[in-house]
């Protein structure tokens, strides 16, 4: 034991302090002698701030820099492991604008851990903060950035396949990137260029649905393999969601998931672009263009950006990052990381504790993940997305965000359809947000 401790101390002494993005580390870490859970040589694990099919999302702290981070934990025995793949995609993306930094990946006890940059609220959170209405200026500033963001992702031979407002985040309040729209959660991403042949993936049909039904392209509903065009079409649907406040295919009722997805797809096809984009002709031009793209075709990103920059200029707007939420008080991350013992293997104990805490004081639980520097009378009405911190919260909803209009959460939830290896129906609390959501049935689909 004495020799092992000395060896460990020596190896820790040899570890250089990471700056920027650090690499993949294969040495396991866990509880220190003080009972604090550590990831890598310098990341202390704090309270759980999110959960999902992947595992848990924890608040963390870099003990070398005193900066807060997000730590994503996935059980090593996961039936559909994806964290290692997501880490590879992040490294493939590198340090582009609006791409969260990844500081560490490696084992942590019985978990794989990925440490990421901590970001601010998602566009869905900000949409709620602005009474679910964005001005044309705000939507154009978002759209111009996200076309560039998607162009960058595509330039790295990846398609995103998970467009939704919860996956686009501003930076931490007070940071120099606080007004930059970031893209996060690459758990559903895919290489569309074969790394060996350097050729585009082949066109296929009868594919399972991957993405979020509310925003996915019409071709995705039809079971066609996704490519670059589908990411851009999904963005167009999201832009109209912000401008309209809702989409015509929200709130559709159906007896089964299959029927619901079918109805959503049918309604998308039946809704003329001119009706969907009424009073926004440039958005109509955008959608017509991306829907006409060939499966293999490279989109003209410059043309699409120019559609919106020209409109921006005609309206006399200035690209000053004065979004609709500027001037509203945004939440800030908690001011302290709680010491936390090693993760328990008994998941039921964690769930029981969380449910008990929630039942005791739901509003206090809502405030637990975030704490304002001063009294905040304008707390977000919506729950803050856990995947805002670069995490991939793969929550699968039986309604997939298209909730019945009589559901109190209708229009507030937007879970992606994932494609794990087997079907499983669960009835436990799944978080696609920082705070605990209401219980709802979830389902996973075959790939």
Curated annotation (Swiss-Prot):
UniProt lists compositionally biased (Basic and acidic residues) regions at 1-16, 347-369
EC numbers: 2.7.11.1
Provide this UniProt record's keywords sorted from A to Z: Acetylation, ATP-binding, Cytoplasm, Kinase, Nucleotide-binding, Phosphoprotein, Serine/threonine-protein kinase, Transferase, Wnt signaling pathway
Keyword ATP-binding annotated = yes
Q: Which CDD domains match?
A: STKc_CK1_gamma
Phosphoserine PTM sites in chain numbering: 413
Q: Where is this region: Disordered?
A: 1-35, 341-374, 391-416
A Gene Ontology molecular function term of the record: protein serine kinase activity
Positions carrying N-acetylmethionine are 1
- Catalyzed chemical reaction(s): L-seryl-[protein] + ATP = O-phospho-L-seryl-[protein] + ADP + H(+); L-threonyl-[protein] + ATP = O-phospho-L-threonyl-[protein] + ADP + H(+)
Binding locations of ATP? 49-57, 72
Q: What is this protein's function? A: Serine/threonine-protein kinase. Casein kinases are operationally defined by their preferential utilization of acidic proteins such as caseins as substrates. It can phosphorylate a large number of proteins. Participates in Wnt signaling. Regulates fast synaptic transmission mediated by glutamate.
Tell me how this protein assembles: Monomer.
Name of this protein: Casein kinase I isoform gamma-3
The species is: Homo sapiens
């Amino acid at each position: 034991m004495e020799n092992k401790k000395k060896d460990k101390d020596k190896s820790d002494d040899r570890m250089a302090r990471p700056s920027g993005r650090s690499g993949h580390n294969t040495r396991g870490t866990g509880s220190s002698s003080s009972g604090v859970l550590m990831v890598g040589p310098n990341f202390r694990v704090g309270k759980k701030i999110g959960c999902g099919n992947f595992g848990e999302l924890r608040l963390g702290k870099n003990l070398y820099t005193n900066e807060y981070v997000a730590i994503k934990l996935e059980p090593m025995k996961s039936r559909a492991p994806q964290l290692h793949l997501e880490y590879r995609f992040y490294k493939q993306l590198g340090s582009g604008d609006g791409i969260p930094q990844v500081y560490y990946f490696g084992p942590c006890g019985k978990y794989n851990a990925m440490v990421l940059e901590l970001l601010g609220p998602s566009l869905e959170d900000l949409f709620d903060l602005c009474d679910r209405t964005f001005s044309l200026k705000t939507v154009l500033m978002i759209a111009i950035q996200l076309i560039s963001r998607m162009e960058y992702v595509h330039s790295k031979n990846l398609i995103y396949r998970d467009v939704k407002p919860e996956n686009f985040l501003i930076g931490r309040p007070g940071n120099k990137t606080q007004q930059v729209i970031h893209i996060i959660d690459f758990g559903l991403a895919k290489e569309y260029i074969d790394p060996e042949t350097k050729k585009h993936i082949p066109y296929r049909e009868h594919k399972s649905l991957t993405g979020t039904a509310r925003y996915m392209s019409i071709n995705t509903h039809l079971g066609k393999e996704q490519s670059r065009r589908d990411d851009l079409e999904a963005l167009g649907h999201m832009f109209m969601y912000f401008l309209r406040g809702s989409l015509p295919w929200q709130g559709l009722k159906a007896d089964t998931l299959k029927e619901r997805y079918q109805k959503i797809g049918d309604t998308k096809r039946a809704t003329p672009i001119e009706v969907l984009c009424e009073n926004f002709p440039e958005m109509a031009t955008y959608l017509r263009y991306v829907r006409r793209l060939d499966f293999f075709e490279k989109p003209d990103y410059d043309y699409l950006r120019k559609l919106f920059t020209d409109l921006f200029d005609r309206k006399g707007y200035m690209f000053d990052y004065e979004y609709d939420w500027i001037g509203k008080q945004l939440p800030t991350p908690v001011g302290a990381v709680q010491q936390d013992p090693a993760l328990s293997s008994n998941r039921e104990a964690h769930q029981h504790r969380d449910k008990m805490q929630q039942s005791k004081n739901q509003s206090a639980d809502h405030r637990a993940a975030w704490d304002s520097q001063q009294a905040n009378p304008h707390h977000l009405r919506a729950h803050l997305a856990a995947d805002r911190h670069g995490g991939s919260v793969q929550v699968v909803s039986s309604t997939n965000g298209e909730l019945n209009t009589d559901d109190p959460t209708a229009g507030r939830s937007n879970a992606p359809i994932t494609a794990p290896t087997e079907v499983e129906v669960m009835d436990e609390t799944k978080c696609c947000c920082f705070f605990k959501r209401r219980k709802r049935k979830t389902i996973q689909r075959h790939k």
